[in-house]
């Protein structure tokens, strides 16, 4: 028990509940109309779930941005004592979501681009294209499985299934036969 005086805490709202309205001062500073309702809101993936229709038990989605997420809607609290997945209340009142998150999904590809793809960045600039287009073509030259090379994307530690802020990235199975395209494909896979 934390013994925190409830008077010190703000009220908790469900995502769609109106918590107030935009004040005249905030309207002047932001350009929003005074009186516009302000709601409890939602986290990025909880909001994405509503936007993509993942609002019933058993529905799910995945996203890859800086991090990678697998998100599933559930009507009941399902807490994994080992912490292999996260459980949160979601944007649908009375419901929950379970998700797995890896910190370094898209981040790993950007890191690889910035550290090892200077030539692709330079060529792409001269071609008025995105360097990722050239990186995709290079990765396509490596077979599925990147010639048995695995990449663990722990550039910023890890959240699930192994919560460990000290976890570090690894190329596993690296040998003298591997080429840059194999490393790139391993990162993508």
Question: Which sequence ranges carry the predicted segments?
Answer:
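Active-site core segments that coordinate phosphate-bearing ligands/cofactors
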Residues: 1, 18-189
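Active-site-proximal cap/lid insertion segments
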Residues: 4
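A glycine-/small-polar-enriched, mobile loop at the entrance of the PLP active site in fold-type I
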Residues: 7-15, 98
């Amino acid at each position: 028990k934390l013994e925190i005086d409830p008077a010190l805490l703000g009220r908790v709202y469900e995502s769609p509940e109106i918590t107030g309205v935009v004040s005249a001062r905030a309207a002047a500073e932001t350009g929003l109309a005074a009186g516009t309702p302000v709601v409890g809101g939602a986290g990025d993936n909880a909001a994405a779930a509503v936007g993509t229709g993942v609002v019933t038990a058993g529905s799910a989605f995945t996203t890859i941005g800086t991090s990678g997420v697998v998100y599933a809607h559930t009507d009941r609290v399902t807490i994994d004592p080992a912490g292999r997945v996260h459980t949160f209340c979601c944007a649908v009142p009375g419901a929950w979501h379970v998700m797995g998150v890896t910190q370094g999904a898209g981040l790993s590809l950007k890191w690889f681009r910035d550290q090892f793809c200077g030539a692709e960045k330079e060529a792409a600039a001269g071609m008025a294209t995105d360097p990722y287009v050239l990186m995709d073509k290079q990765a396509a030259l490596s077979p599925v499985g990147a010639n048995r090379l695995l990449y663990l994307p722990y550039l910023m530690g890890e959240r699930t299934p192994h919560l460990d802020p000290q976890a570090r990235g690894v190329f596993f199975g690296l040998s003298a036969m591997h080429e840059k395209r194999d490393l790139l494909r391993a990162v993508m896979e």
